[in-house]
C-alpha cells in the first residue's frame, strides 16, 4: 500500500468593493457617511483617506481612497478602492441693511457697512467719500441712489464672488 500526502495551498480571493462616486459637495462640508460609504461583499473594516471630517478645497476630480481589510484574511486579500469627488466653491453670506437717509452733501461713510461670514474685501458703488447729488423736481428735493457692493473673499479659490 502506498500513501502520499499533498499540500494544497489556497490562494485568497479578492473582495469586491462597490463605491459609487459621491454627489458634488460645497466647500466647507466635511467628508462623512454620505461620501465615505464603500461596501464590500465580505465582512471587514474600511479605512478612508482623507478621513471623515476632512474639509476639502474646492476643485473637481479629487481622489478619495479606501483600504478594505477583510475579517478573514486567510480567505480574502486586503483590497483598495478609489473614487473622485467634486467640491464646488461656497458662496459667502453678505449682510447689508438699507441705510438711513443722509443730509445733502454728506459723504458716504458709515452707510457702507456690509458684513460677511468670511474675511474679504468689499467694493462699494458709489465709493466711500462720495457726496450724492440732490435733484429738485417741481420744487421738491430728491436723491435716490442704488448703493451696490461686490464682495471678494480672501480665500477666492474656495469662495464665489458676491455681487
What residue spans do the PLM features occupy?
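Solvent-exposed beta-strand/loop surfaces, strongest in extracytoplasmic domains of secreted
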Residues: 1-163
Amino acid at each position: 500500500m502506498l500513501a502520499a500526502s499533498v499540500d494544497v495551498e489556497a490562494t485568497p480571493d479578492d473582495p469586491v468593493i462597490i463605491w459609487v462616486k459621491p454627489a458634488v459637495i460645497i466647500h466647507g462640508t466635511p467628508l462623512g457617511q454620505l461620501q465615505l460609504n464603500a461596501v464590500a461583499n465580505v465582512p471587514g473594516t474600511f479605512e478612508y483617506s482623507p478621513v471623515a471630517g476632512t474639509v476639502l478645497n474646492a476643485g473637481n476630480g479629487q481622489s478619495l481612497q479606501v483600504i478594505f481589510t477583510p475579517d478573514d484574511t486567510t480567505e480574502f486579500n486586503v483590497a483598495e478602492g478609489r473614487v473622485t469627488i467634486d467640491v464646488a466653491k461656497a458662496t459667502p453670506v453678505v449682510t447689508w441693511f438699507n441705510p438711513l437717509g443722509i443730509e445733502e452733501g454728506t459723504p458716504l461713510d458709515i452707510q457702507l457697512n456690509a458684513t460677511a461670514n468670511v474675511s474679504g474685501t468689499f467694493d462699494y458703488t458709489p465709493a466711500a467719500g462720495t457726496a450724492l447729488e440732490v435733484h429738485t423736481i417741481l420744487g421738491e428735493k430728491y436723491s435716490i441712489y442704488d448703493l451696490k457692493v461686490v464682495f471678494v473673499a480672501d480665500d477666492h479659490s474656495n469662495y464665489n464672488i458676491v455681487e
